[in-house]
Amino acid sequence: MATQVPVQSGAEKSNFTLNPDYGKMMEFGTNSAIVSAFIQMLFSSKNKFSFPMVFVMIRNMAVLLLVKTCLEDSKAFLDKFKLTNLNSLKFSWQRMMHKHLTYTIQHQSNGKWMYENTPISMTLLTPFFEQRQILIGRPDNYYYSYRTCLLKISITNERINIIFPDIQSVVQHVNNDIIHRNREIICGDRTVMYKVSIGNGAVPNLDPVAISKAYGTDIYLQLERSIRNYFFIDIVMKFQSIPFCINFNGEPGTGKTTFGSYIANKGIFDRIIIYNLVQSTNFDFKDNLNKIEMKIDQSTNKSKPMDGSEKVLIIFDEIDKWLESYIENKIHKMRDEARVTKQSNGGSAGGDKNTGTIIEGFQKLTPEEEQEKKNQLRFTFLDQLYNVVDGHTLKNNKKYVIIFNTNHFDNMFVGSPERFNALKDRFQKYEFKKLRKREIINYLNYVNDCFKNYDLTEEDKNILLSDTFDVDNLCVSNTNIYDDIPNDMVVSFRNLQKILRANHFNINRVVEHLSQIECSEIFTSDDIPS
């Protein structure tokens, strides 16, 4: 209630308000609001002062200042005990109701973070926690909700404790989303490899991938030398930072994607990202690339200097298939829109002239218009690809090498104007073909050497091998058996892998199988069914 004081003015009486303008106080929210209200009331033309009015005014201002001071001090006092955040009370109640588990991520003397025997990547874990307002660099107790439960994250300089209820869904969340997805798999003392998966809301996720052994084919060795020379020349000459763009073209199963595992073992790159674009046909190429770049920036180690020294390899798999699927997806949506009608029934039984049935339709595209739209989508993609190759899309804070895997590279340029002819020459191209006899023998020798040089532990022998099994049985007894492979033998790398698995990686049996492949009941020619 506003305090009003009657004031005698001649023969009439009038009331005026002594209280400050609370609206102004709420608007400013500072001591200046109180001072402003005091001055406004003091110099108001309607005010006529008397001793009662001054005393009431001083009393009201004193009460306001006292209440404000008490509230500020009490909030600061309660904040010290975290009583203003009820998560601590909720979590205490939750601990009484459920059994809880604790996972500890420990900082090691070598600078790594480990959960039991699993190395954890801080470059991945940091953005995961930051999305939940948890700061690893600021030790404290944090809480975040998962479904109906609270998880407590207790951070110190040496460890991160994750405390959560022993409920199956929550345990799976911690194991999969915190531990598994943020584990660090380092190869070549430096490289971490990820595979892109599309999560909820079409958001790409970087999932760590265990790096497998890969045989160094002639193309792999040649490209490795080119990449090393590219980075060396860039250091010496200080060229403008643009992506080194490469095209792997060839039939499926010829080893294009496997290059990621091969080069990861060399320790040239800091990160390798494999992205099969076919799983993301709702967005154009630029959107997909920007999302991946954002994920890379979010997961960058904040302690590393942003001097452009980080080397990143991105492998876009099946990009020509993605382009066709993307175009067909857009055309399909246009066809659906052409079939849409909207009806609105109104009016009374008597038939109101102002209401009735309204039908809104879309005119179907003619085949010529549909083809024109397909060409427009294709040319837009090629323009975006041109910008990537010219260095206008990605930031310059990293060294990028981008490999575009295709089955039919030229099909992406079908019907394109001459201005895109120069784009074809901007890629360093490698043609992948099926393995011939010499490559088959080289690969079988590589597998043979892997078995010979592997040091079996007692645990391996007890768990994986039987008493009658001998690793030497998998190896080649006499290299002359390779002469039995037909000279005109041609087989894809993927199909050769299938033959190896079907024969339990016994090299002698594999060679025997290859020598009789035409009369085999399991495989026909070099195209082996899945």
UniProtKB/Swiss-Prot annotation:
It holds the Pfam family AAA. This is Uncharacterized protein L712. GO terms for molecular function: ATP binding; ATP hydrolysis activity. It comes from Acanthamoeba polyphaga mimivirus (APMV). InterPro entries: ATPase_AAA_core, P-loop_NTPase. Transmembrane segments: none annotated.
